[in-house]
């Protein structure tokens, strides 16, 4: 899926900013683990709530957890176990871009997802 044909960064950013929600799904793709790549024949698939992912980049590198929320408007996902500690001791979820995670286990209740991934 191509949001724009331009190479200019400003137009790329604008296309992402103005993209409709139904096109943002493909931008929210994450790399698959080796086992899932062999099983589905794809390198990446969109992240869904319930998937188990491993963080590959950033200060939370190495943490594995379940996706509890997918924010299409902000292009971020919330992973259980990836939290910021506030000054008063409370923990707040830390949003991560899907390109910085790897899907290790997929949530399997959606049959359409597997039909499209087996093409």
Swiss-Prot record:
GO terms for cellular component: large ribosomal subunit. The keyword Ribosomal protein applies. SMART domains: KOW (SM00739). CDD domains: KOW_RPL26 (cd06089). Belongs to the universal ribosomal protein uL24 family. Pfam families: KOW, Ribosomal_L26. Part of the 50S ribosomal subunit. Keywords: Ribonucleoprotein, Ribosomal protein, RNA-binding, rRNA-binding. PROSITE patterns: RIBOSOMAL_L24 (PS01108). This is Large ribosomal subunit protein uL24. One of its GO terms (biological process) is translation. It comes from Methanococcus vannielii (strain ATCC 35089 / DSM 1224 / JCM 13029 / OCM 148 / SB). One of two assembly initiator proteins, it binds directly to the 5'-end of the 23S rRNA, where it nucleates assembly of the 50S subunit. InterPro entries: KOW, Rib_uL2_dom2, Ribosomal_uL24_CS, Ribosomal_uL24_euk/arc, Ribosomal_uL24_KOW, Translation_prot_SH3-like_sf. It comes from the Archaea. One of its GO terms (molecular function) is structural constituent of ribosome.
